[in-house]
Amino acid sequence: VNLNSAIVIYPNPSDGILNISGVEKVDAIRAFSISGQLIKEAVNTNRLDLSSQRSGLYMIEIEHEGATSVNKLIIR
């Protein structure tokens, strides 16, 4: 399964609450600043709360069944 085509991150742009659909539960979700610093990580969930983060562009890494997907997220 191509993870990039299977998952959808929404809403994007976001107010900080990130949801993932397309797979049951992802193994891990990691949010990185655009400079590569790990901001937050969650495991065995399809939701990540980034509402405490500043507005801007973030990279979201999703791990599921050995595959990894990286997506851009804009927080308003």
PLM regions with names:
Residues V1-R76:
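C-terminal outer-membrane/trafficking sorting elements
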